[in-house]
Amino acid sequence: MAEITAKLVKELREKSGAGVMDAKKALVETDGDMDKAVELLREKGMAKAAKKADRVAAEGLTGVYVHGNVAAVVEVNAETDFVAKNAQFVELVNATAKVIAEGKPANNDEALALVMPSGETLAEAYVNATATIGEKISFRRFALIEKTDEQHLGAYQHNGGRIGVISVVEGGDDALAKQVSMHIAAMKPTVLSYTELDAQFIKDELAQLNHAIELDNESRAMVDKPALPFLKYGSKAQLSDDVITAAEADIKAELAAEGKPEKIWDKIIPGKMDRFMLDNTKVDQAYTLLAQVYIMDDSKTVEAYLDSVNAKAIAFARFEVGEGIEKKANDFESEVAATMAAALNN
């Protein structure tokens, strides 16, 4: 029987990422053979990972990485927020973003086949991480955007890495691109422009806005406050030339009824039309980057601000950890039973 020294245990831990006791047991079982011990731990890790495969991993981190003209944002999930702060987990997230930015895969399958600096594939790295960290660790998704040599990439993470954003801006500089990414992190746009919104989606969101106004009006009526008007439109996509012409005509009729002299109408109408556009593009303001009020200059929309500095937003991607993942809501009894079963099976 080979002597299992502290030096051997340390070496195996460094190679495998296993805990002290797991490393020592593996060396004992393989009579001190380092290669066999590594393989044994890998096999045990795969078995442990398989047992954890049906668990829901909704915590985690995003990772962002810029490689030349390419930027990547990734989401990696763990089961608990505690593990998401683990140094090994953070290193895995950052390495994932880097290898994806460099490899430019077309989909998750291609991403998982990429080779990490350690020599293992991304898929193998996640199996091993699940085994060594003790929770289900899963690679969920990624996005890539590319720029030309004349454009600028902005990469930004917020809330300790729970939100990750990448963006491309034409004109301006890298600092402007980062500011745009900061805006995206805070304001949660889902698309660049109203032209990307589905017509039915706009109608549904407008109905929700009017329902909220209806509820508000019920409260206002109880305290004798005037009712708020319902919205006829929610997006620029609904504002045809005929709608704009009719709005201008209504404003002119209003000014005439108020007795305002026609010679000053040209000074009043633009402001009222701006108000009309603001009131009738609420869906755009919620979901489209260009229509949102810019957090760095709240006197302008993002589009207006970028125009003022001869710049233009080209593309972006925003990930927030756990969005769209349905967490299991187990009762206390079920949770205890599941924990005991897991302990017996490990």
UniProtKB/Swiss-Prot annotation:
Keywords: Cytoplasm, Elongation factor, Protein biosynthesis. Pfam families: EF_TS. Gene3D superfamilies: 1.10.286.20, DNA helicase RuvA subunit, C-terminal domain (1.10.8.10), Elongation factor Ts, dimerisation domain (3.30.479.20). GO terms for molecular function: translation elongation factor activity. It is found in: Cytoplasm. It comes from the Bacteria. Transmembrane segments: none annotated. GO terms for cellular component: cytoplasm. InterPro entries: EF-Ts_dimer_sf (IPR036402), Transl_elong_EFTs/EF1B (IPR001816), Transl_elong_EFTs/EF1B_dimer (IPR014039), Transl_elong_Ts_CS (IPR018101), UBA-like_sf (IPR009060). Its main location: cytoplasm. Associates with the EF-Tu.GDP complex and induces the exchange of GDP to GTP. It remains bound to the aminoacyl-tRNA.EF-Tu.GTP complex up to the GTP hydrolysis stage on the ribosome. Belongs to the EF-Ts family. PANTHER family: ELONGATION FACTOR TS, ELONGATION FACTOR TS, MITOCHONDRIAL. NCBIfam families: tsf. This is Elongation factor Ts. It comes from Streptococcus pyogenes serotype M18 (strain MGAS8232). The gene is tsf.
